[in-house]
Design a protein with these regions (language model features):
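N-terminal alpha-helical transmembrane segments of multi-pass membrane transport
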Residues: 1-84, 89-94, 101-118, 224-236, ...
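Long, contiguous bundles of hydrophobic transmembrane helices that form the permeation core
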Residues: 2-14, 31, 41, 205-309, ...
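Short helix-coil transition sites and intra-membrane helix breaks within transmembrane domains
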Residues: 23-27, 75-77, 88-99, 132-145, ...
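Core transmembrane alpha-helical segments of multi-pass membrane transporters/permeases
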Residues: 54-99, 276-277, 285, 289, ...
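Alpha-helical transmembrane segments
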Residues: 76-81, 202-215, 275-281, 396-405
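Hydrophobic alpha-helical transmembrane segments of multi-pass integral membrane proteins
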Residues: 80-84, 110-149, 327, 350-390, ...
């Protein structure tokens, strides 16, 4: 078939994923339909190609054995999802999250006026969610935890509920973009660029600059909007949410809540640099030791079974992001499509520095795919074209694509945004503009800043 039909098929596949998930169809089977559209419009044998994108092994042109496909990501990501979800449940069920956020609020907000307490409350919510994502707890697994914590903090400092979505989305963005993060996008970058030996700290200085810029600009903007709401006499109201308990006699000491949060990233950076899930598993063990005994017991239930129940609930939650692994099939399918070569040619022939072209490709592909498939496609092109042929530094490519991943992942039709708005019961016109400014506009400017730094000062890679 012609490249035009193939390109139209790729565009239609993106539309199917975006439209039907927005309408409430589950991502798992919607993606499979989109993959079939790519196969058919590109004249690809359906059964054979589907098997190959799930798992393919063989001998490359240099005589080396290789394995590729979605299954190669599953071996890293499935245990990370599992232990991340378990850790998240232990952290919330024990009251560790409430203890840490309450301590931050009380220490930083002591003797502060109303405006400063609101600013500190915003910081606490964003910081807590960033920590969850930084240590590898999947956003889906931490969603309900953070809604509970954010509700309690926002009620305490009187920030209107319509600002809750931007706090949670921004925290996810910051935690994902931080150098050393165990967030899935960072792990994907490591996996796809494995032959170039990039690490989670690739181009760390530009990465930290990105986080400081986005966080600083966003805090300024959020504080400005919250102050304006206060001047208009807007108050917090619970709506469908229940308040989180920020006080209690049986909460774990703050020091015990911090220990596992230190162990996980340190373990990932040292002993378990090739196995992020192992660092998370050790973090779970540390969590059980540090605050497992603080999980409230039910009458007649032993301490061991109380901890086991919390872990069991974590396993159940882990199934949500695990199913989303199927979403990666779209990225592999598009990368294998003959028409994809035309897309690659378009981006590689853009005028200007190749790294900037890679950044724009990452942003647009993620926005079009509305999922991690866009990042997978961009990483594949980076590994096969931009790095070996166009001479882009692997560490620079890693960092630029990771931060590019944060720009269009929070569009209105994003599954996480739709879920947040629904659960919190906030109308788009009330809650989305703040998200658009902070995690779309500011992150876009941050990507340009990172690319410019790495182009002007290549030694930062």
């Amino acid at each position: 078939m012609s490249n035009l039909v193939g390109l139209l098929g790729i565009a239609l596949a993106f539309f199917i994923v975006i439209f039907f998930t927005y309408k409430g169809f589950h991502l798992a089977y919607t993606v499979i339909v989109a993959v079939m559209v790519v196969f058919i419009t590109n004249g690809m044998p359906i059964l054979e190609t589907f098997s190959d994108i799930m798992l393919k092994s063989g001998i490359d042109e240099n005589g080396n054995a290789f394995v590729s496909g979605v299954a190669t990501q599953a071996k890293t990501l499935l245990p990370l999802y599992l232990f991340g979800a378990i850790f998240g449940k232990l952290f919330i069920d024990s009251g560790a999250a409430t203890s840490l956020s309450g301590w931050l609020l009380n220490v930083l907000g002591k003797n502060a006026d109303a405006n400063r307490r609101r600013l500190i409350g915003s910081f606490c919510i964003i910081f807590m969610n960033a920590i969850f994502n930084y240590v590898g707890v999947d956003p889906f697994a931490s969603l309900f935890t953070m809604i509970g914590i954010a509700t309690g903090v926002m009620a305490e400092v009187n920030i209107p509920r319509r600002f809750m979505p931007v706090h949670l989305v921004l925290g996810t963005t910051i935690g994902t973009a931080l150098p050393g993060s165990l967030a899935v996008p960072n792990i994907l970058c490591i996996n796809f660029l494995a032959e170039y030996n990039t690490t989670s700290y690739a181009a760390a200085i530009p990465g930290f600059i990105f986080v400081v810029f986005v966080f600083g600009a966003s805090m300024w903007y959020i504080n400005k909007m919250v102050r304006k709401a206060a001047e208009n006499k807007e108050d917090f109201e619970y709506g469908p949410l229940q308040p989180a308990n920020l006080t209690g006699e049986n909460l774990p000491p703050v020091i015990l809540t911090i220990i596992p949060l230190v162990i996980i990233p340190v373990g990932f950076s040292t002993i378990f640099s090739d196995a992020p899930w192992a660092a998370m598993a050790v973090g779970c063990i540390a969590g059980i030791i540090c605050f497992g005994r603080y999980i409230p017991k039910k009458d007649g239930v032993s301490r061991i079974m109380t901890i086991a129940d919390s872990m069991n609930n974590g396993v159940t939650i882990a199934g949500i992001p695990a199913i989303i692994l199927l979403n990666y099939t779209l990225g592999y399918a598009i990368e294998a499509a003959p028409a994809f070569g035309t897309i690659v040619e378009l981006f590689t022939n853009l005028p200007g520095p190749a790294l900037l072209s890679l950044a724009f490709m990452g942003i647009l592909l993620l926005g079009a795919a509305a999922s991690a498939s866009g990042l997978i496609i961009a990483l594949g092109v980076a590994a096969t074209v931009f790095i070996p042929i166009l001479g882009v530094d692997p560490n620079a490519a890693h960092r630029v694509l990771l931060v590019s991943n944060t720009v269009l992942d929070s569009l209105p039709f994003s599954g996480a945004i739709v879920a947040l708005m629904s659960i919190i019961d906030v109308k788009y016109k009330d809650g989305y503009p703040q998200i658009a400014v902070t995690t779309v506009l500011f992150t876009f400017l941050g990507v340009i800043l990172v690319a410019a730094l790495l182009i002007l000062f290549p030694g930062l890679a």
